[in-house]
Each structure stands twice: as structure tokens, then as C-alpha cells.
Amino acid sequence: MSRVYNFAAGPAMMPEEALERAAAEMLSCRGAGMSVMEMSHRSAMYQEIFDRTVRLLRELMEIPDEYEVLLLQGGATGQFAAVPMNLLKTGADYVDSGNFAHGAFVEAQKYGNARVIASSREESYARVPDVDAGAIDPDADYVYITTNNTIYGTRFTRLPDCGKVPLVADMSSNILSEPYDVRDFGVIFAGAQKNIGPAGLTV
């Protein structure tokens, strides 16, 4: 069988070694006599798999201990609501740099005072808009960006200076493709399917 090379934005190709191991363990994961899909999420073996996954992600991204790592069901668009539902109290500033950033802003408006502080929407998102530090509300609950835009081929080459306002970043299309200092962010989230795993999981 010849493999098809998929250059779409996602779901992306997965390493053949990972697929072969998953296939080999589909009926019996690590000799357990059952598939990982059949395991209780409270079982010792599942906990071991979970802990190792989190440990490897911490190692690869150099995630400090003061940050939690969550493995969540569903795609990253679910976080468009989860972020404001958990963080938006008085107001949030959004950088409208593409389709997904705009969708996140529209969703946030349902939960409180969200405003766009920089946008390239009128230019069909041909570039990432410049973010003037003076435009950021120092009392905002957070500033929201999408670090990379696969649809338009644009990315943030320099993070906005948010002062003491937490920076929230959707890294779905470039997580683990370039180094970031996690301490520059209050929240990072990413759907797994573009860079680090199968569809249906968000970190």
C-alpha cells in the first residue's frame, strides 16, 4: 500500500511509526488485554499514559510547574467560548488577524465586553495587524491572539507587549513548530490535529 501525502492544514499526517504502534496495540494496549479506548479513565494504566503525555509536553515546551496542562475533549473552537466563560469579567482585547481570531472575538461578545484593538480584516487578513501597546486596556482581563494563520499564511513574528495583562494564544497551527517562552502567556491552547496528534483533542 502506498501512503498518501497530505499537505492540508489539518488533520495533518501522523508519523507512520505512531500509526503502526497504535494499530498493533488496538486490541491489547501494552498487554492489558483491552484497547486504550476501552480502559477506565481511572485505571492505573490509563493514568500512566496520561501522566507520560503531560510530562513529555512539559519537557518539549519547557512548561513551568506553575502552569497546568489540560487535555480536553473537542477541537480548539470550543475554547472560543471556554476562554471568556472562565476569564472575561470586565473586558477583553482581541487582535483580529484571521478567520479563527475573528470567530473567537464574535463568540466572546456573547459573554461580556470584548473589543478589537487591531485588525487586518479590511485587508482580507493579508497581514498580521500591528498592535499598539497603547491600545491595550491595562485593566483588560486578557489580550487574545492567534499566533499563526494557516488560511492566510501569516504569523506573529513578535508578540504584542501586553504589560501586565495576560496574553491568551490560540496556537493550533504552530504549537511545537517553533519555541515560545510559556511565561509570556497566561493561557495557551491548541487543537492537536494540525501538529501534535489526532483530531478531537485540545491541549
Q: Model segments located where?
A:
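Generic secondary-structure signature for well-ordered alpha-helical cores
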Residues: 24-31, 55, 59-63, 110-113, ...
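Active-site PLP attachment segment
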Residues: 185-203
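Short, charged, surface-exposed secondary-structure boundary motifs
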Residues: 103-105, 124-129, 176-180, 197-201
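A glycine-/small-polar-enriched, mobile loop at the entrance of the PLP active site in fold-type I
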Residues: 3-54
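General beta-strand structural signal in soluble alpha/beta enzymes
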Residues: 6-8, 69-73, 94-96, 116-119, ...
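Active-site phosphate-binding strand-loop segment of PLP-dependent enzymes
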Residues: 10, 108, 120-175, 187
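Conserved N-terminal alpha-helix of the aminotransferase class I/II PLP-enzyme fold
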Residues: 34-79, 99, 106-107
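PLP-dependent aminotransferase-like
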Residues: 77-143
